[in-house]
Regions:
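Conserved acidic catalytic loop of the alpha/beta-hydrolase fold
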Residues: 73-91
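Short beta-strand immediately N-terminal to the catalytic nucleophile in serine-hydrolase-like folds
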Residues: 93-95, 121
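Conserved alpha/beta-hydrolase catalytic His-Asp/Glu region
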Residues: 129, 133-138, 148-179
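Conserved HGGG/HGGXW glycine-rich cap/lid loop of the alpha/beta-hydrolase fold
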Residues: 8-68, 82
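Flexible "cap/lid" loop of the alpha/beta hydrolase fold
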Residues: 104-152
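Short acidic-hydrophobic surface loop/beta-edge motif
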Residues: 2-7
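Gly/Ala-rich beta-loop-alpha elbow adjacent to hydrolase catalytic centers
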Residues: 95, 99, 103
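Structural signature of beta-strand start/N-cap positions in the alpha/beta core
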Residues: 24, 51, 89-92, 114-117
Length: 179
């Protein structure tokens, strides 16, 4: 693990595996997770000969937790700082949930700098809430309930979220791992 400073001076934790891999896969996690959500994928990808770069987004994992700067624009700028520092070119960018939205913002703002392929996994994009022209996602009422729970009982919110990550039941130990 290494820290890479973002354009606003925040230390971002970056994990770089199998530096001699044939091609790089860059993994961006979703909320409220860290790069560890990709633990099994990192192992598989490196065993298949890929270099894997993974990030703990600002406020998550071992990255700094600043009071502000949690916009998709800033987080995509963080990704750009990492891409530049690691000298990544011709890499596969993967984003899960909020990480997918950040990956899309990166593609837009930085014109896909260095990216040869984009993989979105259950991306929170193009938007998170339902609209008249976008019937997917959560209703405004559901999002307001999530915000209220985040303000009043964050551990319960994270527990509820962790249970939604799986298509089939898992042990309490696995659920605890996501808290």
């Amino acid at each position: 693990m290494q820290y890479i400073k973002s354009n606003d001076g925040i230390k971002i934790a970056v994990y770089d595996y199998n530096l001699k891999g044939k091609q790089t896969v860059f993994l961006i996690h979703g909320w409220p997770l860290s790069h560890m959500i990709y633990e099994y994928q990192i192992s598989l990808l490196t065993n298949c000969g890929f270099r894997v770069a993974a990030v703990d987004l600002r406020g998550f994992g071992k990255s700094d937790t600043p009071a502000c700067g949690y916009t998709y624009n800033q987080m995509s700028a963080d990704i750009f700082s990492i891409v530049q520092r690691l000298k990544l070119r011709n890499f596969i960018l993967v984003g899960f949930s909020m990480g997918g939205a950040i990956a899309l913002r990166y593609m837009n703002i930085f014109k896909g700098f260095g990216v040869c392929k984009l993989i979105l996994l259950s991306a929170a994009a193009p938007c998170f809430t339902q609209r008249s022209d976008f019937p997917y996602g959560k209703t405004v009422k559901e999002v307001n309930s999530l915000i209220n729970l985040a303000e009043t009982d964050r551990p319960q919110l994270c527990l509820n979220f962790s249970k939604q990550l799986f298509a089939s039941p898992h042990s309490d130990a696995v659920i605890d791992w996501f808290k």
